[in-house]
């Protein structure tokens, strides 16, 4: 710990103690006063929270603190997510003595060996990291109301979740049936993002299997995502060196890779008959089930046996990889299938040639493939003559009947429609099948086992595929504020593809499914409306309500207003006054004003949050805003346990101090961007905060009780502008922009002010107090310290947002002085040897204002001589937008008084004595004709050498 970090930690500990003693962040409903209810995703205590969590929690805290300044009653609570397998899996691995995991926990989290030994108990592990993470959040300075803290295995929470699930079931949104899910073979259970290493969501995709059969009756199921291209197949590809098997599958003897047989075994019955190398099947001919053509099997080392079935169909006219591979073999057989405006018959060939791709190893092949596939899918139409290739092996009238079907539903149809038709037709005709796969493989369970897709029977699902439910979810996304705005498209896309999702497991911590024993509600399903639970748990405890009293009637009354307090009291034994108080608490705080999380949770938690709110609550209780921030890197690299570069939040606080850490997480990137946390930046920000502390001390020590001048008014005006910019940035959740204004730009203004005055005035202390309030959401501890030094009353955390009286004339005065100094420096006579500078001021400010409209007559009417009016109009045109705006908004401005006020500053800046005269002063000498040349806003300048 450096001396600087120790300085900030000591200040933070002092103020955190006072906050806690004063219960300043434990709000109560205040009728008639607007509230602001914000939450951030509660953490899993399977490890200590790190700076990635810290960023999300900081953004929420900045908003919470800002809205306190705006007069809102603010609630920012926190809980801990014990549900699911993450805690259980880590405990099992530690209990088994896994050296890698144990070393990770000791090295990254600094867990002592004696504590590691106890972590084979999952609840001990959870409590350890729960307590440590809570302490880290407190030391980080989060303004959390800890009186509402809970865990997801608390009995009160479990009764709440069971009520939610009964509601979903009664609405027909929970179903039981057959569906593909991500699956851990070791634990024999479905998995989601929170069950996997690095919280990676298993993305389940569907291959269409097309059955090509040889003369011996062996079937080669080619796996494809583009079944509409099967009429254009010229050959199949098989990896000659890969391991394949002959197996019984779907009533056929099939040839597939050994890996595919393993993956398929979780979806259907697969019986391996024998093993073989791929080369055994190279050179055979197989029949296309759609066209009837016989096509050869070629060898190809690019075929990955872990993808699909290890059998790939080749469509060189529409697949760049296939085209290049066949070209390398000296074969060019192209069958056109799809018409796309702007392309010829063979898009794959065209794109390959345009990109100059010479070999199968050219990285540009991937780009070429994306272009062809995307363009054909979005703009492509199947050729009308494709029907001529259908069923050539069939006898009449079967051939004509089949071609008629393809003419109606396939030929001339958009690619997306043709794809849907043929995939369905192949399965119904028993000429193909379906295989599910993890498309973003490899994905690993936290136990280390690779995830596969299993088709489950009798599994409980939340049916996110329900069309009406999807439509209601879309309405909420459309209405609510989502930051960043471009994330709305991501939410809409997620709503579109979401389908049934397994909602229960047979192992792990959590809430039992209320109607089916042996099932535990999984972690991404019990964490969708818990924000409502924060509003009531405090009073549930205060009134001593037992878990068994938290019945369906209780929750219906509290959250939905159903039934009367008297009726519910009779059924539950909960006192009427308790029921009413809890209902009032919920009514005051809900709806949620802002939900804060990482962008990686958009495809799951955040979208489930939307779905479940619209299903459970009436429209007026739907959430109002989601903030989805980017990831946190460390020194340019993704943080991961394997790299040993995860930085726990408590360690980061110890290294830098809480406020420098907060400043760095705020300043390094805007909310929607990924943030690269760098040690050098954190240390630079610590120096900046120390400089702010020193500057305010200097202001306090040197402030004089004298009348304020133009320079003091300029300070007030500039800080007022910064306050306006910061307020707007906070309101728009532009946290970086706000931090730049209050930590760097405001400091620069004060530095400039102190450079212009010999002694600051008491007005400067008023500006400093306003500044401290504005910086408090970012760096609250140093703000409290400075607030106390500046004589502020109470906590700065609860001070109202400052209002400074900003005079545009003060800003114009400073810009005027800057322009004058620049003009002097541009005069050739200025420099070493200059003895004095004589400045002549034309005080007819009304002429300059009149010149803004560019009309000579208007300027003359204001009193200017005609020859002066034209010069003045030309001058005003050269002024920048800022000066012209200030000129328009300023009613009175005295150039003479301004220069007198700034005289000492101008002399110090130029290093030369100055004399100031008004052109109206008859006793003033006209040196070099500069007196009569002076214009409003453009003084005459004479330099004597």
From Swiss-Prot:
Subcellular location(s) of the protein: Cytoplasm
EC number(s) per entry: 6.1.1.4
Molecular function as annotated in GO: aminoacyl-tRNA deacylase activity; ATP binding; leucine-tRNA ligase activity
InterPro entries reported in the protein's UniProt record: aa-tRNA-synth_I_CS (IPR001412), aa-tRNA-synth_Ia (IPR002300), Leu-tRNA-lgase_arc (IPR020791), Leu-tRNA-synth_Ia_arc/euk (IPR004493), M/V/L/I-tRNA-synth_anticd-bd (IPR013155), Rossmann-like_a/b/a_fold (IPR014729), tRNAsynth_Ia_anticodon-bd (IPR009080), Val/Leu/Ile-tRNA-synth_edit (IPR009008)
Motif mapping: 'HIGH' region: 43-53
GO biological process: leucyl-tRNA aminoacylation
Top-level EC class: ligase
Chain location of the short sequence motif 'KMSKS' region per the record: 638-642
UniProt keyword terms in alphabetical order: Aminoacyl-tRNA synthetase, ATP-binding, Cytoplasm, Ligase, Nucleotide-binding, Protein biosynthesis
Family annotation (PANTHER family): LEUCINE--TRNA LIGASE, CYTOPLASMIC, LEUCYL-TRNA SYNTHETASE
Protein name: Leucine--tRNA ligase
